[in-house]
Design a protein with these regions (language model features):
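Short polar/acidic secondary-structure junctions
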Residues: 59-61, 74, 174, 190-191, ...
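Surface-exposed, glycine-biased beta-strand/turn segments
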Residues: 83-194
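Short peripheral tails and domain-boundary helices/loops at the edges of structured domains
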Residues: 97-102, 249-265
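Flexible, gly/ser-rich surface segments that form the specificity/activation loops bordering the active-site cleft
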Residues: 134, 186-192, 228-242
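Short, well-structured beta-strand-loop connectors
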Residues: 176-187, 215-233
Length: 265
């Protein structure tokens, strides 16, 4: 079993709701590692020469408050290793017009959506947590204009209220859509809201999602390099114009993918 050290000094960091963060923790006491949990969820981590890198994310709906991360080991049931001071990010709002069928859902559509939620839950539960499949930093999928930013409160047809869990890029059809980093294709298929979708597992609890595609160019289980063309842009699912919805999930939370890139993760 892998042995790592437990830190002496408790670290403290600031983080916005909806953002991901990488923290290096220096260790100095040999123990058998099991898990690291933040916000009650297991988070990704890997080993370096003098410690571990922890990859956590702050849930979008979390309020300004102080939270703690814990290390679980064979020697200690739980030990505090990190204190996170959550700060509220000033997200915007927008009003969108989409086909009525995507707002006032028929019973069959609700049942379909519920099945999709369960299917994707299994995909995310199979996440690779303690190993990275990538060696380079993540990159924006497209250099084009961002048409809708992460975290916006979204009102559909003046009645359906939600929030935007990804970043939308302008992508006229047919624009080739590249992967943001190396990883394993975890899902391909047509989803009610997201249309034709590709999901990549990058390890360390990090997933990227590419939605509304007109064509999928990937197979579940294959390892794709950074920049591999996984699909062609489109207007499938709940969409009012051709574009790419790019979603990033870290430690089970949909986060602002640009925060991942900004830190060089």
């Amino acid at each position: 079993k892998e042995k790592l050290d437990v830190p002496i000094k408790l670290q403290e960091v600031d983080a916005y709701n909806g953002f991901a963060k990488k923290v290096f923790i220096k260790l100095n006491e040999k123990v058998e590692m099991i898990n690291i949990t933040c916000f009650g969820k297991k988070v990704g981590f890997d080993r370096t020469n003098s410690g571990i890198r922890v990859f956590f994310s702050v849930p979008y709906k979390h309020k300004e408050k102080t939270y703690k991360c814990f290390l679980e080991t064979k020697s200690y049931s739980k030990r505090e290793i990190l204190v996170i001071h959550v700060k509220k990010y000033p997200y915007q709002e927008e009003f969108l017009k989409v086909p009525k069928k995507h707002v006032d859902l028929a019973t069959k559509d609700i049942e379909r959506w519920k099945k999709e939620v369960l299917e994707l839950k299994k995909v995310y539960e199979a996440s690779i947590l303690k190993r990275a499949l990538f060696t380079e930093p993540f990159a924006r999928p497209l250099p084009s204009k961002i048409t809708s930013s992460y975290g916006k409160r979204r009102v559909f047809n003046n009645k359906k209220d939600s929030w935007h869990s990804g970043v939308d890029f302008r992508a006229r059809t047919p624009t080739e859509i590249p992967s943001s980093n190396r990883g394993k294709i975890a899902f391909t298929g047509h989803l009610f809201f997201n249309g034709n979708t590709v999901i990549i597992d990058h390890g360390l609890g990090i997933f990227t999602m590419y939605c509304h595609l007109s064509k999928i160019n990937a197979l579940v289980g294959e390892i794709v390099p950074k920049g591999a063309i996984v699909g062609i842009s489109g207007n499938t699912g709940r969409s009012n114009a051709p574009h790419l919805h790019w979603g990033v999930k870290v430690a089970e939370n949909w986060i602002n993918g640009l925060s991942l890139i900004k830190q060089g993760i």
